[in-house]
């Protein structure tokens, strides 16, 4: 019923002039997402580009100035489960927490307080069982939270939307809190200028060539 009641959702969403706080240290960013697989998030500080996380129809990538060695890691989508990519650097996960994807192919659902909990059973990149839960706010008719639990039912990472923009009768994220429990890392997204169904520049989906590239398949540090 939730999916049928939703307004017609956009094929793309973009945010400009965002502030990203990582353990209270802030950077600026722009985020663009065009279904099904085009994604780009570039974060900058006064020292220049800090992170570049992206995806196109064929491959995904991430680069961080703070990682040593500072490679641009990439792989094809079909090999995602064969890589050691951690959740916070996974464009697929970031697309999900923006809240404009259809909710489908889930294993079960139930109501929890004012939320509809949608449950997915999956395996991570190490072939360990994980459980993904999305909480849908039935009053606002939109995504509230996204949670991943390990095989011991311990919460690994969560993303909760605490404030929304109302655009074209649809609630989209304005503020997202991400808690990566494994690394004791808290990230806050304060999302700025939002646009739905905007024609996004195709150059956004091109992997940058100005960094040394390493395929995640077979890579070990």
Please provide the spans of the model-predicted regions.
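Gly/Pro-enriched, hydrophobic low-complexity segments
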Residues: 110-214
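Extended beta-sheet lipid-handling architectures
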Residues: 13-17, 26, 43, 55-57, ...
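Hydrophobic lipid-interacting interfaces of membrane-associated proteins
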Residues: 18-22, 46-49, 166, 181-183
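Edge/loop elements at the starts and ends of beta-strands within beta-rich repeat scaffolds
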Residues: 5-13, 24-25, 32-37, 139-141, ...
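C-terminal low-complexity, charged extensions that often adopt amphipathic alpha-helices
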Residues: 73-112, 216-221
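Short, surface-exposed charged micro-motifs
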Residues: 30-32, 50-52, 133-135, 163
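An acidic-aromatic
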Residues: 37-92
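N-terminal leader/targeting segments and the immediate start of mature chains
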Residues: 1-24, 88, 212-221
